[in-house]
Structures are given as C-alpha cells and as structure tokens.
Amino acid sequence: MEESEFAAYEPSEEGLYLRFMGRGGPAAIEIGARIRTSRDIDPLAGLDIGSDWSFGSALEAERSAWRELWEERGIEIEGDEAAQTAMRYVIYQLTANCSARDSSVSIGARGLSHARYKGCYFWDTDLFLAPFYFLEDAQAARSLMRYRIGALPAAKEHARRMNSAGARYPWMASLDGSEQCESWDIGASEVHVTADVAYALGDYLEWTGDDELFFSGGAELLVETARFWLSRYSPAPGGGVNLLFCKGPDEYCGITSNNLFTNLMVRRNLELAAEAAARLSREDREQYAALKLSPVEALGWLELAEKIPVPRDPETGRLRQDDSLHLLEPVYPPSLKQGDGASYHRVCFDRVQRFKVIKQADVLLLMTRLPGLFTPEEKAAAWEDFEPICLHDSTLSFATHALFAAQNALPDAAERYWEKALYLDLRDVMGNTGKEGLHLACLGETWQTLAFGFAGLRLGPDGPELRPALPRGWKALRFRFLYRGKSWRAEIKADAPPALRED
C-alpha cells in the first residue's frame, strides 16, 4: 500500500487547506491547536505548538497530568468499589469544570455541561463547591476567592441600587458580578448569598492561612458586606431588629422574615468583619484608614450580631426556620411527589408555597455549616421537625441530608441519602440530568459528605482532626487533603482508630 501524502498550506483568511496526493490507504492527519482568548494577558503568546508535537505526545502528557492528579486527590474506599468509582467521577467533574488558573470566572450551577441559568454563578459555588478546592486544589481555591473579591465593585453598586450601604452580592452573578436574576422575589429576597460569600472566605482563610489574599481584598470584602447588613436590618420594638423580606435556602417558603439560616450566617459575617477590622488596625494601619474603619463601627457590627433574632416556638423552645413556616397549610408531603422528580412539575409554584413543606435543607444545612452553635438536642429536634416535610425538589438537598445524618449518628439516613446524592447524575435520579446538565453543587456536597461526614474531618484547636462515621460495609477510607499549604493523609479503618498525619 502506497503511503498517502498531503501538503499543508499556511492559514489565510479563508482557512487552512490540506491537499492530498498519491494513492493508497487512508491518511492519518494530526492537527494540533492552542486556544487563546482576549481575556489572556498575552493572547498571541504560546500559539506555536512546536515541530515535535504529536497526538501521542499530547496523549501521554494528558495521562501524566491525570496520574499526578489522582495521586493527589484520589480517594480509596475499601469495601465498596462502586462507591469509589462514583467518587472518582465526582472528583473528575469537579476538577474538569473549574478554571483553576483564571480568577475572572467562577463555576456555574451546571458547570460546562449545560447553559441552564445562563451559566451564571450562585451561592452554590461558595457553600457547596468551594470546600473541595480549599482542601484539594490551592490554586483553584484562590481563584474562586479572587473572583468574588474582583466582583466587589459590582457588589457595592448592587447595594447602592438597592438603597443599601456596603456590598451586596447578586443572586445570579455574571462575569462582571452584576445581577442577572429576572425574578423580583428571588433576586431581591435571597440575600443570604452575601453572607455565604463571606462565610466561604472565612472558611478559606481558616484552611489555607492565606495572609496575602486577606490583605489584598479579603478584609475589604468582609468589611463591605458587614456594612451592607447594618443597613439591611430593620428596627423592632424594644430595641431589637428584624430581617424583613427575605427568603432562605428553602425557596418554597415564600417571602418571609427572620430566616434562621440567613440570620446566623449574617451573624458569622459580622463577626468575621469585626475580626478583620481588628487585625487591620494592628497589622495594616494604611488599609484600616483607607477603608475609613473605626472601633465604633466594628462595635456596631457586634451589637447587631447580638440583636439578630433566633426564631423559636414560644412553647417548646424548638428552633423555627423563620417567622411563617409554622403558619402554612399542613399537607402530606408524599402526596405532592412522584418518585424523586421535583414536585413543581406537578403542583404549581403558587400552590406549593402555601403548603407546610420545604424545597431543600435549610435549618439542617445551617447546622452542617455552623455546627458549634447548636446542642445535640437542638439538632435532633431539627431533624424530627424538618426532614419529614422536605420534598428534596432541589438537587442540593440529598447530599446535605446525608452530611447532617453522618455527622449526627443517623447511619440509616446517611446511607440512604448518600446513595441518592452519589448517583444523582450517573443514574439520573431526578430525571433532569440529560435535559439540564450536571448538578455541580450536588457533586461538591457529596464530596463534603465523604470528607466531613463519613471521615469526620474538621478543624479543631490544634488543626485537623477526625471523628469518623463510616458506612456499614466499608472496611477503610483513605484520602489526602491540604491544610495551611501542606499535604495531609487521612486513613479511617472500620476496626482501628483513625489515623491522620502530615506528608
């Protein structure tokens, strides 16, 4: 068989031309390409692929990169090969859908798999996705925080447009950080996103100790978001305050007031801002002055934090989700569902908002993010009150319930919800993966269930510690993570004490 020949012409305005010559079998053509965009610092640099390029060399470079990545991020589950394979899928998607080196972008709700929600950025990234990168990819973690810091001017403008002070982050953020939500009730009332951004930054600083980021925008973000909250709360009789016209993670509650999740995340935001102001006053007086900070202002944040109400049943003392959920119409939740698909496909949104049901974890989500604020009795009561009325109509819900259950000695529930979350997209549990793309936040929360639930990883007074609760049938769980710039290894065995060591 004669070898086919071809000649390649230089690119022109009309394109790249290949001329085939000779006779014989098929010709193998290898075309290499590099991509640069106008957002790159030097978009024309590095376009030459070099004469030694080949498909084989590119493939080997790709394999080498993934081998290194799996060595760093791989999870070993001994006793459940299917779960380990599914978790590798989770890690693959979380890695592939994040532009780790580009702080001008974040991660959309559907990643790169779909244009649902216009590709915009939500609180999903800050609460459900970011912790994976904090512990597994330092560069990606920093880029995600840099994106929020870079969007601070847009957040300040958004607050101004909403007749507020400081910085208010949008519900649906575009590339430049501007609000894209067209629904007045959701976009205007789901203000918890601002506290979520501050919470994520505080979490990032705790895990990484990134002083440079703190002093180059991080502290300012905490300060400006605190200033927003000082202007957002309304005075109440007796010297108290109320958070009016708000909506928590449970989007079925309608417009309410004093959502517990929002209130206590705001309290955390205010405390972080006060700590940041105190640190600037000690270590960066120039920035302290530039931000026009004062001890009086920081004291005002702490005073507001003390006044923020915690809704409770006046007779039992049990925590309430907000000021109105208990007033809604009782209903038997399974009557609204058909399998695991969302009930809003069968019941109109107006109607479902009048039922005493919740769309997704709200109080339970709060208890996984700020667990130290609640007693074991309060957590048990919250599970009794809110788990039975949750419709799990958001893909954010299954994994959060699994995480809560794993952290609070509810093994049956932990394994049941973990199964749904782990295979949500692989098995199309909710029947919308093909139509709407991958659910990145569920993938991130599934990883958190494994790390912070089953492994029980958390930060104690002296650094990382483990309080595991392995699923039945698992013989061992092993993984690596980052803490303060160093790599650590965790090993949890069913028949031995957990082991944690620095590499």
Region annotations inferred by a language model:
Residues 1-116, 348-349:
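Acidic/polar, glycine-enriched structural segments that form the non-catalytic walls/loops
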Residues 69-105, 109, 263, 283-325:
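Gly/Pro-rich turn-and-neighbor structural signature
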Residues 88-95, 115-119, 123-134, 191-203, ...:
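Contiguous, well-ordered alpha-helical segments that form the cores/surfaces of helical PPI scaffolds
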Residues 89-96, 147-154, 220-232, 268, ...:
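Alpha-helical scaffold segments in carbohydrate-active enzymes
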Residues 98-113, 139-199, 205, 212-214, ...:
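Helix-terminus loop motifs that line ligand-binding clefts
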Residues 113-121, 167-216, 224-303:
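The feature captures the catalytic groove of carbohydrate-active enzymes
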Residues 119-150, 216, 278, 288-435:
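Active-site core of glycosidic bond-cleaving carbohydrate-active enzymes
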Residues 128, 177-180, 235, 252-280, ...:
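C-terminal capping/lid segments that line or modulate ligand- or cofactor-binding pockets
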